[in-house]
UniProtKB/Swiss-Prot annotation:
PANTHER family: 30S RIBOSOMAL PROTEIN S2 PROKARYOTIC AND ORGANELLAR, SMALL RIBOSOMAL SUBUNIT PROTEIN US2M. Keywords: Ribonucleoprotein, Ribosomal protein. Belongs to the universal ribosomal protein uS2 family. The lineage of its organism: Bacteria, Pseudomonadati, Thermodesulfobacteriota, Desulfobacteria, Desulfobacterales. Pfam families: Ribosomal_S2. This is Small ribosomal subunit protein uS2. GO terms for biological process: translation. GO terms for cellular component: cytosolic small ribosomal subunit. Signal peptide: none annotated. GO terms for molecular function: structural constituent of ribosome.
Amino acid sequence: MAYVTMRELLEAGVHFGHQTRRWNPKMKKYIFGARNGIYIVDLQQTVKMFRDAYDFITDVTAQGKSVLFVGTKKQARDSVYEEANRAETYYVQNRWLGGMLTNFQTIKKTISRFEFLSTIENDGTIEDYPKKERVKMAKERVKLEACIGGISKMKNLPGAIFVIDPKNESIAVKEGKRLGIPIVAVVDTNCDPDDIDYVIPGNDDAIRSIRLFASKIADAAIEGHQRYLEKQNAGSDKDMDEAAFGGSAPVAAAVERTIESDGSDGPVVEMIRRKTIPAE
């Protein structure tokens, strides 16, 4: 369990919000005060609210569901890419395509096209096409990778969405809300927190702040997935045990005694046989 500490938040500059003239009044309850024209985030609330977000992400992945990382602005791209890959989950780091979630069946067709182009490039069969066609397909593959490369293995909708800057990722937030997918987001002083299920008040512009939160959420996803695997393995072991006993474990052993010789022509001989009685 890797909850964030006050010291980590301070060192990453999480407490620095936007200028006082650029704020959303709905964030007032998460603001400690202002200094030199900059709002200061109440980090005591951040610590508590991040703990709730962390536990939620852990619970989601412990159920075998995925988390979609979203951060398309320049400061967030590297952290989103690296931490999502570390957690072996999905991400959008360049541009959110409208309908990426709400029109997922169509997006699946685009993913299939991307997989086809990647396959023929990797196995060399692209060389069977005319040069003009090869150039065209190579450009198409690069373009698709930039848009959907991070979700190319996603077969179902995610169990949660982790967003850096919900104001910048407003389309992703709207699609998630429309589909009832819970949203966890780093919310700065200029954002509207109303559409966010798990608000993490803090700086969503500083690279260090973004990386801190992305890495911690990745830790939560990894922890939850590990729990999921442990439950799966425990279930498999139980099934194997039951199969070994024909679906039920033995609960008693009956003793059957048989007199082989009554002693008239020598010592008394008694045979003892144990019979297993399976559970009903």
